[in-house]
Amino acid sequence: MTGKTLMADKLAVMADSPADYQRLGLSPTTIAPWEDGARTDDSAGTYEWWYFDAHLADGAKVVVSFINTMDLAEPKSLAPVLRLNLDLPDGRHFEKLVHYQPSEWSAAKDHADVRLGTNRFTGDLHQYRIQATAEEISIDATLTGEVPPWRPSTGYMLFGADRSMEFAWLPSVPQGAVTASYSINGEKHETTGVGYHDHNWGNVGLMKVVHDWYWARGQAGPYTVIASYVTASEKFGFEPIPIFMLARNNVLVGDDPAKVTFEREGIYTDQKTGKPVAATTRYTYRDGENRHVVSFTRTHDLSANRMIDSVKGVKRIAARLMHFDGAYLRFVGDLQISRYRSGELVETYKEDAIWELMYFGHAR
């Protein structure tokens, strides 16, 4: 059986053929500002979000997302949400979800310019400004790209025999410099840091096509990494889709998923969600005599939430009847990046990192 036949038989793939690029109007070598503009029309069945996170020099960690609907299982209508998480070095932790009317949401198509009430997320693939307020928390951050915009092939994961179901991803700023001011009840802080921005969208409920994914990004020494391992749902054969990008001194080292091996170690059952969690996830990238080993090792959880707990009323009853037990876990721990040449360790670096496990399916 040929490689082409094998690929055709797969029910979950990353779109990467010349025909895919042509159909989607994308270049295999460059990324255009419109790609970070609105990619859906906010219609029923679609979803989209713009995401930013930063590790700040004062020890704080911030996450901001502008989301057109939180209903990723069965998106039916525009129901915009601002998500703002802030972790402070003194141990205080804030998780905010603020819901807005559809009329308060807008997103430009030619570049990133998303407005949600008085909040704004705007940029041009190189420099972004994120302004967000949720109750007593507010942040105003500027993100300037250091690692160039990147996407895994076209960025589109396609599902089904006809490949009509899509989930797409654009890491517009794999790593950038951040200047930020944030306040808690008027207590203002100004600092700098390292940040990241990406953009997701799709036309099918994620729980229909994805069983689970690990997603991570981080920086250690001269290295920047984005690493994800997506497992398609049972209907699509639990097909794995590895995603990997490694840069050194802001220059791409490698991003060929065929050269990546993914491993889970120290698997335990999370008590709150009942999901199997790997204490360590490891991505090994082999290219000729060079081998890069990227490991994420958990020290504690930032959050561990059952998705049904955020669903209310009739939707909650329906979710229970469907035995839906999806979960979202976010971890803090150590990122270690080591480079070997001909089997000999050349260099190794370690740094703090944040990563996540999104688990839509039943534990397996």
Annotate each predicted stretch with a short phrase:
Residues M1-R364:
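Structured soluble/peripheral alpha/beta segments that form catalytic or ligand/cofactor-binding pockets
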